[in-house]
Each structure stands twice: as C-alpha cells, then as structure tokens.
C-alpha cells in the first residue's frame, strides 16, 4: 500500500536517502479514508516534462512535478486502474522537444516478481556457503512479462543508498535506485530495456554522504583500460564442444598423468600490427609499443594452441586473465574477479579459446590471485564506505610492499566471494586448474610486515586463511574431480598437498621452489666448481615425496635483473646451450610435474618484458631452433614413458644408482607402476667427456638410448652410445649388472631396458649384436 509524500520525504528521496524506491515509485495504491485510488510516480532527473503513455492507445498523460525537474506524479480517478504504460520525457537540454526519450518504468515491475535472490540465497550468502552466488549477484539479463531487461544486485551492507548508473540514465544515480533486501546487505533492481553490452557502475552513497562509483564485483565483463565501467554480459550464449574432454578429465587422476605446462602471458606472447586489425574489430593497442596491438582470444586460439600442441605440452597456464587496470601488474592486481579481461576480447571469445584447447587435447590452467587486491577507487577497496572486502587494521589488511589490500578471509561474504569465484572459472569457462598465487603471503600474518597482529594463540599462522584454503580445495574437488589446484607456496609450510581431512590444505600440486632455486644456483656456477656443491643437485630427493610437487621455471625467474635462462648459464655459446639442455633433461626426468615459461623453449636472451612480445626472430638461428626441438622431444618422451609420470609423487618411483659422484655426475632409475616400465637416467654436469663411465643396472639386457641431450639434432657435439649399450655381467653400485657408457659433456642420457630376447629380435639392434 502506497502513501502520499510530504515535502521532507520528497527531498529525502530525490537526494538518495531512501532504501526502498519501490515504496515510492511506480504504481502505488493510496487509501484515504474510504477512498482508494492509484497514482504513478517517476523519478526522472533533468526532465522538463514527463508523460505516462498508455501502450494500447498511445494516449500520453502529462505527469505533475513533485520536485522541480526530478520527481513526477500522475493520479488516477478512484476506481480507475493503472493501464499498461511506458514513460516519455523531454529533458532540459532538449528545449524544443526534438529528442524525446521513451523507456519502460522499472518500478512498475514489483521486485518480488523479478527478484531471483530468495531468502535461502541470502541466508547461504551471509553464511558464506552460496557456491553459485555469481548467478544471483551482478548483472543478469532476464525477461519479465515479455519485457527484456537486466536484474542488478550488489552487496553493500553499510551503504545508505545504492543506484545503478550508465549511459541508459545519463550516469545519474537518482533514476535507478536499488532496494535493500532485508538485513542481507544486498541491494537489487530490475531495469527494463537494458541488455548485453550496456556499460554500468554502481553509485554507492555511504553513511557519511560520500558518493563512490564502483565497478561490479560480480560483473562478467569490464571496459578496456583505462575505462573502468562494467559491461552487462550474457554467459549463456556460447555453445561448447568439449563434453568428451570434460568426461575424460573427471575420470582421470592427474597425479598419475603426464603434465607439462607452458606458462603464458597472453599480452606479450605475440603481437600484431595495428595496421592489421582483427576480424572482429577488437583492436586494443599495446601500451609503450607504438603501432602494435594485442592478439585477440580467437587469434590466440589459432596461433598459440597449435604452437603448444606442436611442442607437446599438455597444458597452457595463463597469467591472470581476470580484469586488471594496469598492464604492468602482469594481471596480478585484479579488479574484476568475475570478468575475463577485455584486452583480448569478450567472454565468449575466451570460451572459444578454452574450447579449442580442449578439442586439441590441451588443458587450460588460470593463475588466480586471492591474496590481495589493488586500491583503485573503482574497485573493491572501501567499497561501501567501510573496509568491506579488506581487513580494517592495516597491520593485517595491507601489503605495504605491494601497495595492495588483503581480503578479510574471516568474513563470510568475502570468503564466499572468493570461493564462488574459483568455482565460477571451472563452471563458466571450463578451465582445468587454478594456480593460486602467493600462498605464503596468505598463510603468515607477519609475511613481509614489520608490524603485525598475532592469531588468537599468539602465533603467526593466519588461521582464517588456512580455513579458507581447506574449504576452497574441498569444494573444487567435490564439484570438479580431475582438475588441478596448484599452490605457489614459497616456504616449508607442511602438508600443503595433503588432504584436508588429515590436516592438509588440500591442494593437489605445489610448486617446488626449493628445487628451482637449488638448480639455478648450481647451474650458474662454472662447471669446475660444481663438484663442491653436489648437494644442490641431490638435496631435492630428500623431500621430493613429502608433497605432490611441480617443477617450475616460471616468469618470476626471468625478470628484475635475474637474466633469462641462457644468461644464467656459464661459458661460451655452445656451453650455455649444452648446460640448459642438461638442466631441462634433468627437470623432465626428476620426479614432479613440469612448467616452463614462454620463450624458455627456444632460449630467449632478453628478460621477459610485459610491454614487448617474444624474440621470435631467434628461431631463424640453428641453436635456438634446435633447443625448441629438444623441448618438444622432452615432452614427447614424457608423454610416451609411464615411468616418468605414473609415480611422480611416490618414493617407489625413484631410486638412486649413484648420487655421490662429486665429479658432477648423477644416475638414477625412474619406475612406472608397471614393473616392466623403468628408465635409467645419467646426467653429466661437467664439460668433460667420460668415455668409460660405468653404472650399475638391475636387469641384464640391452639399454636403448631414448634421449641424448648432446645429439647433433639438438645442436650438441654428437658424443653418445650409438643408440644403446649391452650390459656386462659385472655387479656395480650394489646392482647385479652394469653398463659401460660414454657420457657426453653437459648432458642428460635416458636409457630404456629391453630384455635380451626382445633386444636380439629387434632389427634396430642387429648391427650392435654383430
């Protein structure tokens, strides 16, 4: 039941101090004594005249102003119902009435009828357990009584008033005010006539009267930087073709599968000229590189995916593709967690990219940043005039070194925002894994802080973040079995990849940062001095099976003056390439899944520069082209040899032959689950040829050389074992048989045992038998 407005109430309403516009605007039934009549109110800022137009007859009824150029009202005679109508207005900037505006009155649709956020939704959200809240909050195109529009909803519990602003209302927050839904802190409104592609923001009026214009935290798309508006997007318009891939993924144990990841920053992998615009016209220039543009998601699908498939990688890992305002952050300072960045195209374009990858047998992993967010005014910071998403105390809620804010993991709605976001990427974009950034910064309350607040037990462990990770990973694997949840955790925090029910964090992989640092420190040394630091090569096997590890040479290792991979290797050109091949060979035979950053596959000299694309011209030179061929060969070896992946996380999958040869040589065996699947690996990290090097082996027979990193085809010297070696009946290294090998300089050898009878019957070995 409606009511007549006093002058004071009119002033409150037109100054956005009302929390239920539906009680004032639209059709209102008024009762005065025994008399009952209907009236319609409309808030139209900067209107010279407003009409209510009866749809059936076209009759226009002028509305009377209750407040100059803002609030208008039309009363109907008692007993006269409100007809089906729309509104028409003449704005003050159109004195001649040449450009009248017409629109559907959003407030003629009762919110109870159009609102799809029920009491259960609000309860689960406030409890922190609404796993698909992204289907409720944000902007969602819907149809009501045949009228197309968008349902907007946002969480801002401490705001005095919230409105939707956009081109459709001249960015005036008075026209489309939202209604507060009970005590949930959620505000909602249905705006007819708005559809996909419309740019909008939320105008948030704080309790202190300040007004902020905020992007939608749950928005599915945003404008290309430097613009900051959200864009209405319908994520249901793309038709997927990857059902077979998804079914196979759900039935596969990734820990027993070959995983080799190509880490990519989409904005700097490859560029195009602005004189060669994309077919869809979505041309976004690269900052600091004139006459150059980004490739679109669809162009990347045509170029990047075939490239990755040719090299044999199993997955592509994308540096963050959630919307971020600053290119120089590499994507790690996210504003729109639910919006795939518009730099490279639309949400449907990104779906196409993932779909194409799946059709080519390649998984897609996305870097995810729940540890912090930037302070940009249009983002999450101080969202409703209070520290809503972040901790209020800067000793807990701010990363001084990064200039960013920390999510309040103890607040139900914030935790829900992040966990639902992780599930959203699997649900809507069919991704195959998340690589969670900067986990250590979340686990420790004193991480990079001089002043910090201890937990309730006096310790430095961030208990709320620990609970967050456990809930996150439990839900990821509940809904999406077979996917990856990878932790970038740079400390020795225990049980990162252990199940949550035994006290672990629940990830299924963790980057092995210790192995990476040890190996880079070792290979930086002159080979002569490596003999004095042999422990750097072998130490990783002391803990290799305490977690499920991924060996990663990531983007962080080729920036900020660290030099690129070749630049880390000592010696002349030949020795640099030989050392890098030996390192990659050891990496691909060492227990653990693999990750290489883009450009490492062909040996770029320059450090990674986010403003430039890769130095593709290097591939015209033989050493670089053959290094790329070598990486492709390693990937093919990994895929074809179960001994290299089925027991990556089990101590049964590894045995040292000799780890104590301080001349810089190691040898070991990798075992598959099938007892007949095993490989012998020998690494010579010195520039010396060892022509009569003997190692012990467990079985008599012929050992075929599957890989020699010093082969001529890889730009090596060609020293080797002529395809393989027969065993000698001499025990060695506490094993019953032995091989006498010729070890090439700076090399990795991989040999596969063949039983004597099989070897003798093999045509490729007849010459050696003779």
From Swiss-Prot:
CDD domains: AmyAc_Glg_BE, E_set_GBE_prok_N. The keyword Glycosyltransferase applies. GO terms for cellular component: cytosol. One of its GO terms (biological process) is glycogen biosynthetic process. Its EC number is 2.4.1.18. The active site is at 437 (nucleophile), 488 (proton donor). It is an enzyme of class 2 (transferase). HAMAP family: GlgB (MF_00685). This is 1,4-alpha-glucan branching enzyme GlgB. It comes from Synechococcus sp. (strain JA-3-3Ab) (Cyanobacteria bacterium Yellowstone A-Prime). The lineage of its organism: Bacteria, Bacillati, Cyanobacteriota, Cyanophyceae, Synechococcales.
């Amino acid at each position: 039941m409606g009511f007549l407005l006093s002058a004071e109430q009119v002033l409150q309403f037109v100054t956005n101090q009302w929390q239920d516009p539906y009680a004032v605007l639209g059709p209102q039934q008024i009762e005065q004594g025994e008399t009952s009549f209907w009236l319609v109110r409309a808030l139209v800022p900067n209107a010279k005249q407003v009409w209510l137009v009866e749809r059936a007859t076209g009759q226009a009824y002028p509305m009377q102003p209750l407040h100059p150029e803002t609030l208008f009202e039309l009363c109907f005679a008692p007993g006269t119902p409100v007809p089906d109508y729309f509104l028409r207005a003449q704005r003050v900037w159109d004195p001649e009435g040449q450009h009248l505006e017409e629109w559907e009155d959003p407030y003629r649709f009762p919110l109870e009828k159009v609102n799809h956020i029920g009491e259960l939704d609000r309860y689960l959200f406030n409890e922190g357990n609404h796993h698909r809240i992204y289907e409720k909050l944000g902007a969602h195109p819907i149809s009501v009584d045949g009228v197309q529009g968008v349902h907007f909803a946002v969480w801002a519990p401490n705001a005095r008033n919230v409105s939707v602003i956009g081109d459709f209302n001249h960015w005036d927050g008075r026209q489309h005010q939202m209604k507060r839904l009970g005590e949930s802190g959620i505000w909602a409104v249905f705006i007819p006539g708005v559809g996909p592609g419309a740019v909008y923001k939320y105008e948030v009026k704080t309790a202190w009267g300040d007004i902020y214009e905020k992007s939608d935290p749950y928005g599915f798309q945003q404008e290309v930087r430097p613009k900051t508006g959200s864009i209405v997007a319908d994520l249901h318009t793309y038709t997927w073709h990857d059902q077979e891939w998804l079914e196979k993924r759900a039935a596969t144990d990734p820990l027993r599968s070959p995983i080799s990841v190509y880490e990519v920053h989409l904005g700097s992998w490859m560029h195009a000229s602005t004189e060669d615009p994309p077919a869809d016209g979505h041309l976004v220039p690269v900052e600091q590189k004139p006459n150059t543009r980004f490739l679109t998601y669809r162009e990347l699908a045509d170029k990047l995916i075939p490239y990755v498939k040719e090299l044999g990688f199993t997955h592509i890992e994308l540096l963050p593709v959630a919307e971020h305002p600053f290119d120089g952050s590499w994507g790690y300072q996210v504003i729109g967690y639910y919006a795939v960045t518009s730099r490279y195209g639309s949400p449907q374009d990104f779906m196409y990219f993932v779909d194409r990858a799946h059709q080519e047998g390649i998984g897609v992993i996305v870097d995810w940043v729940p540890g912090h967010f930037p302070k940009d005014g249009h983002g999450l910071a101080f969202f409703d005039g209070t520290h809503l998403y972040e901790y209020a105390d800067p000793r807990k809620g701010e990363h001084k070194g990064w200039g960013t804010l920390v999510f309040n993991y103890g607040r139900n709605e914030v935790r829900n925002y992040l966990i639902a976001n992780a599930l959203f990427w699997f649900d809507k974009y069919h991704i195959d894994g998340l690589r969670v950034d900067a986990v250590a910064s979340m686990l420790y309350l004193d991480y990079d802080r001089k002043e910090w607040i201890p937990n309730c037990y006096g310790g430095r462990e961030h208990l709320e973040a620990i609970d967050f990770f456990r809930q996150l990973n439990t839900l990821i694997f509940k809904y999406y079995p077979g996917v990856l949840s990878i932790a970038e955790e740079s400390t020795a925090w225990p049980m990162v990849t252990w199940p949550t029910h035994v006290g672990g964090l629940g990830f299924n992989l963790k980057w092995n940062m210790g192995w990476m640092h040890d190996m880079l420190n070792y290979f930086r040394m002159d080979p002569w001095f490596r003999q004095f630091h042999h422990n750097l090569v072998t130490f990783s096997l002391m803990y290799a099976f305490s977690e499920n590890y991924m060996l990663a040479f990531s983007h962080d290792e080729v920036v900020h003056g660290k030099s690129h991979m070749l630049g880390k290797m000592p010696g002349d050109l030949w020795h640099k390439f030989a050392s890098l091949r030996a390192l990659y060979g050891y990496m691909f035979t060492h227990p653990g899944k693999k990750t290489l950053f883009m450009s490492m596959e062909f040996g770029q000299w320059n450090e990674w520069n986010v403003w430039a694309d890769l130095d593709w011209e290097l591939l015209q030179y033989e050493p670089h082209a053959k290094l790329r061929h070598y990486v492709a060969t390693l990937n093919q070896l990994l895929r074809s040899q179960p001994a290299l992946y089925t027991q990556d996380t089990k101590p049964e999958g590894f045995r040292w032959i000799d780890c104590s040869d301080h001349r810089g040589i190691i040898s070991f065996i990798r075992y598959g689950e099938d007892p007949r699947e095993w490989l012998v690996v020998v690494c010579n990290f010195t520039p010396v040829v060892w022509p009569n090097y003997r190692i012990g082996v467990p079985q008599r027979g012929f050992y075929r050389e599957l890989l020699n990193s010093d082969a001529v085809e890889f730009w090596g010297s060609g020293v080797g074992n002529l395809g393989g070696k027969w065993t000698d009946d001499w025990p060695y290294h506490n094993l019953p048989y032995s091989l006498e090998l010729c070890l090439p300089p700076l090399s990795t050898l991989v040999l596969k045992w063949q039983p004597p009878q099989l070897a003798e019957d093999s045509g490729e070995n007849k010459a050696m038998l003779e």
